Amino acid sequence: LEHKLFAAEEGDLSLEFEKMGASVNAFTSFNETMYYASGVKNVGPMIDLLFKLVGQPYFTDENVAKEIPIIQQELAMYQDEPDWILGDRLLRGSYGDCNLAIDVAGTKESIASVTKENLQAAYDENYVASRMSFVACGDFTDNQVKTILRQARKLSDQYLKTGSPQKEADLVPLLASGQDW
């Protein structure tokens, strides 16, 4: 799912980030999937594109089939790393036949069974505003933070199903500009 959200009808969205001088990436762990973009200019358009990336999935039979061997190869690469092997054995030893024993990336067999329909079902279940957080980090003034948060609210309303609505209080900075940890 994480890989496929970079796909759009018009092509690979990561190329759009590159055109504006930004980088974008994602990762999935046991408890979260994070999509992030970094750049020093074009913050507004970068945020727009990030919400488009997570809010407009483009799943086709063709692009899902094309991604399966890529993900299987990535999984095989991880399975050659000693720290992955140790973690995998620890999970299997701790959880046995429970689903928690299976690596978050899945297995070669489970990856082969992915379809656009089950990707869409997983997306619909998990990619809702009430299950997502937006974080902006940088040297922003208080007014810039307020502008970014208003933009994030508008884009969330535009691109994401609500689930249970976030209150405005959920969209406040953790630290005011200029504060130290």
Task: List each model region and its residues.
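Short, intrinsically disordered, charge-balanced linker/junction segments flanking boundaries
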Residues: 175-181
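Charge-rich, well-structured scaffold segments of protease-associated domains
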Residues: 9-175
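Catalytic Zn2+-binding segment of zinc metalloproteases
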Residues: 1-11
